[in-house]
């Protein structure tokens, strides 16, 4: 290989493949709260397939299980915990502004 072509070749970097979030023995069920809670955001929304790194079939089963758990009130539909609380309230100025004509 001559020098001009060698500049454009990329070095092959080794990478470690991540473990799948659902193993073959895991059962996707509405009662398995430890598994289901991994696929829900802090606001209580179902995370997407790309974020979860699961297959389409697994994502469908997760969605069904989460919806069943919500209906049976095992999971909340929304998680409305206030993350930002006011430390001190600032008083507003009550002076009246008058227009000059």
Curated annotation (Swiss-Prot):
Key words of the record: Chloroplast, Plastid, Ribonucleoprotein, Ribosomal protein, RNA-binding, rRNA-binding
| Entries under Gene3D superfamilies matching the protein | Ribosomal protein S18
Q: Does the keyword Cell membrane apply?
A: no
Keyword Ribonucleoprotein among record annotations: yes
Q: Which Gene Ontology terms cover its molecular function? A: small ribosomal subunit rRNA binding; structural constituent of ribosome
Which BP terms from GO are recorded?
Answer: translation
Q: Which SUPFAM superfamilies match?
A: Ribosomal protein S18
Q: Quaternary state and partners of this protein?
A: Part of the 30S ribosomal subunit.
PANTHER family given for it? 30S RIBOSOMAL PROTEIN S18 (PTHR13479), SMALL RIBOSOMAL SUBUNIT PROTEIN BS18M (PTHR13479:SF40)
Q: Which family does it belong to?
A: Belongs to the bacterial ribosomal protein bS18 family.
Please name the HAMAP family in this protein's record: Ribosomal_bS18
| Name this protein carries in UniProt | Small ribosomal subunit protein bS18c
């Amino acid at each position: 290989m001559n020098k001009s072509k060698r500049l454009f070749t990329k070095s092959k970097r080794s990478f470690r493949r991540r473990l799948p979030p659902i193993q073959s023995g895991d059962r996707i069920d509405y009662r398995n709260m430890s598994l289901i809670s991994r696929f829900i955001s802090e606001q209580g929304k179902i995370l997407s397939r790309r974020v979860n790194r699961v297959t389409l079939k697994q994502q469908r089963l997760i969605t069904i299980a989460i919806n069943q758990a919500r209906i049976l009130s095992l999971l909340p539909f929304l998680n409305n915990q206030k993350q930002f609380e006011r430390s001190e309230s600032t008083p507003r100025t009550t002076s009246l502004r008058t227009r000059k004509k």
